[in-house]
């Protein structure tokens, strides 16, 4: 995402991947909130360059505790990244990625997962290619019934973005996903619209009002229904170490969050979700998250 007060050169810089279209608006709605969870994230790096990331959370409604552990090592000389993953469902994952070695802008990733409890295995080959004005992606999910192919393309010029995303299920010999998106992006404004499978329509607007205030509007509608989903969110930077976030939707769900950097590498987030239609009935949710990084 471009920074405030800057615009992309013409022709524009590398466009985002399809999954990242509209990301600036989504981040205002999602980051700084953690309703119904008590969460701890820890990140550290060894002297040899190995990165360790661990995360644990407890659901305040169900009491269920989940956790993940990830180690990552980058061999920069050869553009290689090795990643090992584990979670409390006892699923093991291995990922090997190589970037900018075969050709500039090309990244290849081989991703596997294995569950010792069930014996289930999965494999995926991911590829992405990004250059000025274009961002392409192709992933292949391997399955015993037949591989599924995911493809995407985003083209950009002078701030305008156009993207297409599809999934072809070889077992069924048909397209199972067919999505389009159009958007416009400048340094402090982003507009994104999308159509998913011809039935789901959505749009979002991101606006950096000033250096300390970011706002976002989100709209979604599904054909065949009278239900339109609408939301407004904002984030205000109180000072370099603290920020407050708020959002509300047409279901009268009101969310607020407060993030404070206690010291370098230590961040605390408090959040609350209030049902505006039944304030006295209860059912509201609180959240607490602590991030440690060294």
Curated annotation (Swiss-Prot):
Post-translational modification: Ubiquitinated by PRKN during mitophagy, leading to its degradation and enhancement of mitophagy. Deubiquitinated by USP30.
Chain positions with Phosphothreonine modification: 118
Subcellular location: Mitochondrion outer membrane; Membrane
UniProt crosslink position (Glycyl lysine isopeptide (Lys-Gly) (interchain with G-Cter in ubiquitin)): 31, 64, 120-121, 172, 277
Record carries keyword Acetylation: yes
Residues carrying N6-succinyllysine: 31
Entry GO MF terms: ATP binding; ceramide binding; cholesterol binding; oxysterol binding; phosphatidylcholine binding; porin activity; voltage-gated monoatomic anion channel activity; voltage-gated monoatomic ion channel activity
GO cellular component: membrane; mitochondrial outer membrane; mitochondrion; pore complex; sperm midpiece
InterPro entries listed in its UniProt record: Porin_dom_sf, Porin_Euk, Porin_Euk/Tom40
Reaction(s) catalysed (UniProt annotation): chloride(in) = chloride(out); K(+)(in) = K(+)(out); a 1,2-diacyl-sn-glycero-3-phospho-L-serine(in) = a 1,2-diacyl-sn-glycero-3-phospho-L-serine(out); a 1,2-diacyl-sn-glycero-3-phosphocholine(in) = a 1,2-diacyl-sn-glycero-3-phosphocholine(out)
Similarity field: Belongs to the eukaryotic mitochondrial porin family.
Function according to Swiss-Prot or TrEMBL: Non-selective voltage-gated ion channel that mediates the transport of anions and cations through the mitochondrion outer membrane and plasma membrane. The channel adopts an open conformation at zero mV and a closed conformation at both positive and negative potentials. There are two populations of channels; the main that functions in a lower open-state conductance with lower ion selectivity, that switch, in a voltage-dependent manner, from the open to a low-conducting 'closed' state and the other that has a normal ion selectivity in the typical high conductance, 'open' state.
Record's protein name: Non-selective voltage-gated ion channel VDAC2
Lineage, uppermost ranks: Eukaryota, Metazoa, Chordata, Craniata, Vertebrata
């Amino acid at each position: 995402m471009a920074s405030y007060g800057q615009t992309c050169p013409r022709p524009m810089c590398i466009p985002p991947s399809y999954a990242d279209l509209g990301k600036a608006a989504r981040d205002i709605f999602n980051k700084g909130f953690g309703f119904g969870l008590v969460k701890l994230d820890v990140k550290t790096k060894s002297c040899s360059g190995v990165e360790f990331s661990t995360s644990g959370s407890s659901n305040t409604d169900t009491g269920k505790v989940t956790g993940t552990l990830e180690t990552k090592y980058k061999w920069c000389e050869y553009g290689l990244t090795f990643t090992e993953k584990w979670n409390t469902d006892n699923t093991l994952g291995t990922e090997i990625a190589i970037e900018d070695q075969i050709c500039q802008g090309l990244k290849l990733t081989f991703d596997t997962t294995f569950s010792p409890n069930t014996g289930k295995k999965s494999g995926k080959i991911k590829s992405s290619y990004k250059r000025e004005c274009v961002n392409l992606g192709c992933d292949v999910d391997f399955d015993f019934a037949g591989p599924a192919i995911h493809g995407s393309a985003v083209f950009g010029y002078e701030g305008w973005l156009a993207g297409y995303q599809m999934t072809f299920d070889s077992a069924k010999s048909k397209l199972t996903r067919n999505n389009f998106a159009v958007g416009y992006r400048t340094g402090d404004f982003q507009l994104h619209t999308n159509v998913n499978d011809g039935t789901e329509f959505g749009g979002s607007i991101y606006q950096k009002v000033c250096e300390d205030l970011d706002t976002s509007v989100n709209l979604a509608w599904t054909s065949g229904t009278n239900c339109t989903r609408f939301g407004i969110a904002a984030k205000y930077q109180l000072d370099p170490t603290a920020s407050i976030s708020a959002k509300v939707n047409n279901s009268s769900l009101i969310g607020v969050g407060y993030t404070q950097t206690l010291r370098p590498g230590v961040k605390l987030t408090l959040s609350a979700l209030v049902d505006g239609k039944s304030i006295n009935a209860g059912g509201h949710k609180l959240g607490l998250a602590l991030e440690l990084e060294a």
